[in-house]
Amino acid sequence: MDTSARPTMSQTAESAADGAAAEIHETHTGIVALVGDRAYKVKKPVTTDFLDFSSVDQREQVCVREVRLNQRLAPDSYLGVAHFSGPQDGPAEPVIVMRRYPDSRRLTSIVLSGEPVLEHLSAIADAMARFHAGAE
């Protein structure tokens, strides 16, 4: 990935400059912070039977790969990889920067609102079919 295209921390911080509180979601392998119109995802330094995120370099590689793969279907959603650094010395932590969408655009919210979902599901199915038709 071209590092010149990556968002800088000053660019990512601008999106949080409005003082919006962060909403944090945690899984066994990562943490996602929702701030303003951005979502920031970091990989935890964990090792399991199926993955190894134990080093910053490994987490960097995984983040770059995730962005590259997911930009194929969601180029406007996956914005790049930035880096967080703390007050202590040490390597900066890679963070995936994504566009945050309103909760009202989640399929769960659409279903719960009673809005018909057939068109949404058809659009998803069509996009997936086109994607897989072009796969090698």
Which ranges hold each PLM region?
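Conserved ATP-binding subdomain of kinase catalytic cores across diverse folds
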Residues: 2-136
